[in-house]
């Protein structure tokens, strides 16, 4: 299984319940498409280097994932691009 790390930035003015629902939804997108979520945690609220959609801060969330193929990652990528609550995301393959 290949290991991946996903980092995404959530808009800072989101309510706690909505943030938890968003994280649960995107974790389930990964697991429903065959990936295993090893760890999913909110990192912290950080100042951005530049404005993204009129925001100067963002909530960073990091997810460690194991997957046999990239179907789950492609679906995560597709849905996170159209979600207004996710400002940016990045998927990185970890070399073991």
Curated annotation (Swiss-Prot):
Belongs to the bacterial ribosomal protein bS6 family. It holds the Pfam family Ribosomal_S6. Keywords: Ribonucleoprotein, Ribosomal protein, RNA-binding, rRNA-binding. InterPro entries: Ribosomal_bS6, Ribosomal_bS6_sf, Ribosomal_S6_plastid/chlpt, Transl_elong_EF1B/ribsomal_bS6. One of its GO terms (biological process) is translation. Binds together with bS18 to 16S ribosomal RNA. One of its GO terms (molecular function) is structural constituent of ribosome. One of its GO terms (cellular component) is ribonucleoprotein complex. The keyword Amino-acid biosynthesis does not apply. This is Small ribosomal subunit protein bS6.
């Amino acid at each position: 299984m290949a290991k991946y790390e996903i980092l995404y930035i959530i808009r800072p003015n989101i309510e706690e319940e909505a943030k938890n629902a968003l994280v649960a939804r995107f974790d389930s997108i990964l697991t429903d498409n065959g990936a295993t979520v090893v760890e999913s945690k909110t990192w912290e609220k950080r100042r951005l280097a530049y404005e993204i959609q009129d925001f100067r801060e963002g909530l960073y969330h990091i997810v460690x994932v194991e997957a046999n193929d990239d179907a789950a990652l492609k679906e995560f990528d597709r849905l996170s691009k159209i979600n207004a609550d996710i400002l940016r995301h990045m998927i990185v393959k970890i070399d073991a």
